[in-house]
């Protein structure tokens, strides 16, 4: 039996595997492989032994059974110096390196026409068994499950002639993370199809999600709280705070991340060029304008005091002109955009503490795939689909004698979109595709309306002739009466109150056009 180290390679993702195998041979390894991996390596002139030739047991059941054999798992699990005699007695050669990644279950079940048979056949059995065996015996065996680690392993073999205990332990932890994620995906997929495979439940019997640490944070929401930022192992792929790249500024804080997410999610909701400024997770100014710099200046003018130290988000590449306007106007904690025009960082460098981020391309509002939202409660987790509900003019029900004008209709849809991202109870005043007053987070809806009016007055913005959006229905007519007092001429709200007749009558009395959306946007 050869004394050379032995590597077992069996991969579904065959990227870089040929160069890795050649590197292992150069490092002195003999290679053992299965099925398609064996054929790929041998067809490319790489010396490799097929598992069936080593075990003396041919693959069977269409490949379902090929590595589930004592000569494989004995070689992986054997403890050097303790199980040597048993291994020798049974002709088991120690396996020192296992290179395995698993059947593409996620890719298979992502297909809209996937069948139950296809899903089941793509549940890997032998792969996870080898991965877990090697990870358990990491004192003696290295396990590689990700092609991203190939170069690390080869470099260490080149530098030291072996794979260190520290590296083996790190690879073992990655392996257990890999199999945990894999089994979680299977449980989620099948667990949502207990009643019907063709009509799955949105929520499985158990819910598994794997998060990867992106960074440790200095502290949490407050300095006495510890915190870290985790991202989903398989995110949606769209530009987000979890995909963002930081180009300058201080390290992001817990609150920076939360507020930047709020700003970016709001600005994603507009197909036109928009700017959103957020403070404490609430928009304090939003504007749409083809001229990005003007969009920023208009959003800022809604509430200059609250905008100080805020988060500024754009849904178009940040231009030099806009960057200069920000630097000249205010201090911002974070500026985020899909990308940066060349030269922007030369301008923002004047405010070296400002965090400048890019998030990558943003999808159009009607092309976003709903992800899950999570809210922690003591002893549990509330899970819901992300609120991506969209309203068009065709969805609106005019409930008053007076119909909104075309201009008012555009402003109603604009303020309705903003209201979705304001903490409830939410009231948004707007005109000409910009906010002029935002009332957020009050226990009384009419008080939110009063605050929105106060904000507008404080910023010297006229509410006369503006429109108003409410994230939920008005329970009493006082909200309509208050709107009339400050000159609101059109209102958008979900409707659905037992007193809708009273609020409609109030709007008619005041000569206000009002539309119902039939959709609520509570935000807690």
Swiss-Prot record:
It catalyses: (6R)-10-formyltetrahydrofolate + 5-amino-1-(5-phospho-beta-D-ribosyl)imidazole-4-carboxamide = 5-formamido-1-(5-phospho-D-ribosyl)imidazole-4-carboxamide + (6S)-5,6,7,8-tetrahydrofolate; IMP + H2O = 5-formamido-1-(5-phospho-D-ribosyl)imidazole-4-carboxamide. InterPro entries: AICAR_Tfase_dup_dom_sf, Cytidine_deaminase-like, MGS-like_dom, MGS-like_dom_sf, PurH-like. Residues 1-145 form the MGS-like domain. One of its GO terms (cellular component) is cytosol. GO terms for molecular function: IMP cyclohydrolase activity; phosphoribosylaminoimidazolecarboxamide formyltransferase activity. GO terms for biological process: 'de novo' IMP biosynthetic process. Pfam families: AICARFT_IMPCHas (PF01808), MGS (PF02142). Transmembrane segments: none annotated. CDD domains: IMPCH. Keywords: Hydrolase, Multifunctional enzyme, Purine biosynthesis, Transferase. Its EC number is 2.1.2.3, 3.5.4.10. Pathway: Purine metabolism; IMP biosynthesis via de novo pathway; 5-formamido-1-(5-phospho-D-ribosyl)imidazole-4-carboxamide from 5-amino-1-(5-phospho-D-ribosyl)imidazole-4-carboxamide (10-formyl THF route): step 1/1; Purine metabolism; IMP biosynthesis via de novo pathway; IMP from 5-formamido-1-(5-phospho-D-ribosyl)imidazole-4-carboxamide: step 1/1. Belongs to the PurH family. The IMP cyclohydrolase activity resides in the N-terminal region. This is Bifunctional purine biosynthesis protein PurH. It comes from Psychrobacter sp. (strain PRwf-1). The lineage of its organism: Bacteria, Pseudomonadati, Pseudomonadota, Gammaproteobacteria, Moraxellales.
């Amino acid at each position: 039996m050869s004394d050379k180290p032995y590597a077992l390679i069996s991969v579904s993702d065959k990227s870089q595997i040929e160069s890795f195998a050649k590197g292992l041979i150069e490092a002195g390894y003999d290679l053992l492989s299965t099925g398609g991996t064996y054929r790929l390596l041998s067809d490319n002139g790489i010396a490799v032994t097929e598992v069936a030739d080593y075990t003396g047991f041919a693959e069977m059941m269409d490949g379902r059974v090929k590595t589930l054999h004592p000569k494989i798992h004995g070689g992986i699990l054997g403890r050097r110096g303790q199980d040597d005699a048993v291994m020798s007695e049974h002709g088991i050669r120690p396996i020192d390196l296992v290179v395995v990644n698993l059947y593409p279950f996620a890719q298979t079940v992502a297909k809209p026409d996937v069948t139950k048979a296809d899903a089941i056949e793509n549940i890997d059995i032998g792969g996870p068994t080898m991965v877990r065996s090697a990870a358990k015996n990491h004192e003696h065996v290295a396990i590689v499950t990700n092609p991203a680690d190939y170069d690390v392993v080869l470099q260490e073999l080149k530098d030291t002639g072996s794979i260190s205990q520290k590296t083996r332990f790190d690879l073992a932890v990655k392996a257990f993370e890999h199999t945990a994620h894999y089994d979680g995906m299977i449980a989620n997929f099948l667990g949502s199809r207990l009643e019907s495979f063709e009509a799955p439940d949105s929520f499985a019997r158990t819910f598994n999600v794997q998060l990867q640490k992106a960074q440790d944070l200095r502290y949490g929401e407050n300095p006495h709280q510890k915190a870290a930022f985790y991202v989903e192992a398989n995110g949606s792929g769209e530009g987000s705070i979890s995909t963002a790249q930081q180009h300058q500024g201080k390290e992001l804080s817990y609150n920076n991340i939360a507020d930047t997410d709020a700003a970016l999610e709001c600005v994603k909701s507009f197909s036109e060029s928009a700017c959103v400024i957020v403070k404490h997770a609430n928009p304090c100014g939003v504007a749409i304008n083809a001229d990005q710099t003007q969009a920023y200046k208009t959003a800022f003018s809604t509430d200059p005091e609250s905008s100080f130290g805020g988060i500024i988000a754009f849904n178009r590449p940040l231009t030099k002109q806009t960057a200069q306007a920000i630097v000249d106007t205010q201090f911002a904690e974070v500026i985020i955009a899909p990308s940066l025009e060349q030269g922007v960082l030369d301008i923002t460098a004047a405010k070296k503490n400002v965090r400048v981020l890019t998030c990558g391309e943003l999808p159009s509002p009607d092309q976003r795939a709903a992800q899950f939202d999570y809210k922690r409660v003591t002893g549990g987790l509330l899970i819901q689909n992300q609120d991506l509900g969209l309203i068009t003019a065709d969805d609106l029900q005019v409930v008053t004698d007076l119909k909104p004008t075309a201009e008012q209709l555009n402003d109603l849809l604009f303020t309705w979109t903003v209201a979705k991202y304001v903490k409830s109870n939410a009231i948004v005043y707007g005109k000409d595709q910009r906010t002029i007053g935002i009332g957020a987070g009050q226990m009384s809806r009419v008080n939110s309306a009063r605050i929105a009016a106060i904000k507008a007055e404080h910023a010297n913005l006229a509410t006369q002739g503006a429109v108003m959006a409410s994230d939920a229905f008005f329970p009493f007519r006082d909200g309509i009466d208050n709107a009339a007092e400050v000159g609101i001429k059109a209102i958008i709200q979900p409707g659905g109150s037992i007193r809708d007749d009273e609020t409609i009558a109030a709007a008619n009395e005041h000569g206000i056009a009002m539309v119902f959306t039939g959709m609520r946007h509570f935000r807690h």
